[in-house]
Amino acid sequence: MEIILFLTMMVMITYVFSGYLYRVALVQSSRVDLIFTRFENMCFKIIGTDLEHMSAKTYVKHFLAFNGFMGFITFVLLIVQQWLFLNPNHILNQSIDLAFNTAISFLTNSNLQHYNGESDVTYLTQMIVMTYLMFTSSASGYAVCIAMLRRLTGLTNIIGNFYQDIVRFIVRVLLPLSCLISILLMTQGVPQTLHANLMIRTLSGHIQHIAFGPIASLESIKHLGTNGGGFLAGNSATPFENPNIWSNFIEMGSMMLLPMSMLFLFGRMLSRHGKRVHRHALILFVAMFFIFIAILTLTMWSEYRGNPILANLGIYGPNMEGKEVRFGAGLSALFTVITTAFTTGSVNNMHDSLTPIGGLGPMVLMMLNVVFGGEGVGLMNLLIFVLLTVFICSLMVGKTPEYLNMPIGAREMKCIVLVFLIHPILILVFSALAFMIPGASESITNPSFHGISQVMYEMTSAAANNGSGFEGLKDDTTFWNISTGIIMLLSRYIPIILQLMIASSLVNKKSYHQDKYTIAIDKPYFGVSLIVFIVLLSGLTFIPVLLLGPIGEFLTLK
């Protein structure tokens, strides 16, 4: 009942919040202008931008240049961190390959962590590098999504200014909400301090170092920005990051807030096309929510069912291996599905200890990479499937392929297919390399089916810019650091460039009014068709390897 109530509340909250996002996205005046405008203008002066509207090509150039500069600075700071200030725990520099992976991971909103937060990064890098990139990577994804929506919906005839979009989103959305969430988490016991680790003597007489630091400030944007990288190695399974059931709900709600609001924002932007087309966003929301609930139900069933091998020994009950007692199997499964559906990557239990079908659920969500998804880019990925569904359905019934009164031609379809293929190609090719290269396969700690699942989960998490992992895998090696770094880089920027190209190409075409010769995108059957094509296309791509991994493991448990 608490899960149903929580999900219902989040749907209502995100619908209301989308109204505020609409004003931010369209640079409309609001009551908070007096508070934020001066700070925004100061940021614009520091950046040196004149706020002129950019072309799509210029927008992408500035997006890539901004991200490239941040990535370089991050890499340098990580390899010299031991000589900088705010290092009371005397942490050493990261290796070149680990710094490469870490910089790309946080730059791309993935937060795949091949390091231990307690022992491999200083307070300075936690705040200046990790926390800063959590803001900017999230805002970058939002900015390019809004640019795409402006073009597709025809709400304005401009794509916008990249720096204006990113600054407004950080100042008016991320910073205020992060401060609020940080305070809420501190009231629940999450630490916020710059003191060195505590050194205590245990009851057995041994010395133990207890790691903490500025956790609350990182924890808030970690979930709000769908980042996922933990201050501590145990992530949100540790009491310092996620002390109780209330902090657990705060963190889950933070993950869901902005990606769900983006779909409602899309609906508000479609309002110029009339009430009928406005319902299109609702159809998309219901379709994605249906897949979300289906995967959640499957995961919870598997986790509550437990391990059949233990049941044969007379030990019944849910699968509690790798889980925190304060959350139990239900809230652990919910957190797992939310963190992979919204591509956050934060964990409150160990995914490597999930049952085979329990691990299949989050893996499938990352392979689909469209069920709400991360900040901005999740909606962009969904729209690619929408365009693909419109095109296929139109050809099947002999109608004209068009979307929002814009015809879909050969040029757009080439880009759409390329965006669709990038994701599985990166996952499957690099997974094959991991099994072929001896040094890489030595990182697998489990034999047979589960070892395949470990590799597939790692590569899928990197390609989906998620960041969670089956942490039994020994991933801090040169191969895993470089390979996953390349995957995160390519899977982030190539689709974004192509998606903006698609939007610009569509809007430059001659539009015409919807008639009987076009597919109605506001009808329930379109939502059903979308679900079928998402499952069918992704199923054909990944079902062979899933049979070798989690499904094969499930069939061996008797």
Swiss-Prot record:
Membrane topology recorded in Swiss-Prot or TrEMBL: Multi-pass membrane protein
Annotated Gene Ontology cellular component terms: plasma membrane
Protein name: Potassium-transporting ATPase potassium-binding subunit 1
Cell membrane in keyword set: yes
An annotated Gene Ontology molecular function: potassium ion binding
InterPro entries listed in its UniProt record: KdpA
Bridged cysteine pairs (disulfide): none
UniProt keyword Ion transport, yes or no: yes
Sequence intervals crossing the membrane: 1-21, 66-86, 127-147, 166-186, 245-265, 281-301, 327-347, 354-374, 377-397, 416-436, 482-502, 531-551
Keywords, comma-separated and alphabetical: Cell membrane, Ion transport, Membrane, Potassium, Potassium transport, Transmembrane, Transmembrane helix, Transport
Localization annotation: Cell membrane
Record-stated family: Belongs to the KdpA family.
Quaternary assembly: The system is composed of three essential subunits: KdpA, KdpB and KdpC.
